[in-house]
A protein has these predicted regions:
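C-terminal and inter-domain tail/linker signature
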Residues: 1-131
Length: 131
């Protein structure tokens, strides 16, 4: 994955073009972040379709490095509340480690995101918030 590839991926993610986003993933990816584990493309679609009903999420890439096996990104993930995403809604959807977001609230988080690659496709994703 090149920087240009990742720029296209981030642009598709920011535009919520899930079909284009999913084209970057292997058939059965494994994502693990903040207590969520996703192992199929359908789970990936379901998770982001749910979350993005409540928030507008965008990724700003600050640093990028890659090899044939790994892409590493440091960036700012911006979350803007479109509707109230309450503790009750989060808990009911297995998202206990996520924070509530009120309509109009903006959260910006620096994240390190690591993508493991096989044949140019994302097979695993992990991320960490950096204080």
């Amino acid at each position: 994955m090149t920087r240009d590839d990742y720029e296209r991926y981030a642009a598709a993610f920011n535009a919520r073009d899930y079909d284009a986003v999913f084209d970057f993933y292997a058939e059965n990816p494994r994502m693990a972040f903040f207590g969520i584990e996703i192992t199929t493309r359908q789970q990936l679609r379901d998770f982001y379709s749910f979350l993005h009903q409540y928030v507008r999420e965008t990724v700003v890439i600050e640093k990028f490095a890659s090899s044939e096996e790994l892409a590493a990104v440091e960036g700012i993930v911006r979350i803007e509340g479109l509707r109230d995403l309450t503790r009750e809604i989060l808990d009911a959807n297995g998202m206990q480690q996520f924070f509530p977001v009120a309509q109009g609230e903006v959260q910006e988080m620096r994240q390190y995101i690591h993508y493991h690659l096989e044949n140019g496709k994302i097979v695993t994703v992990g991320c960490a918030i950096v204080p």
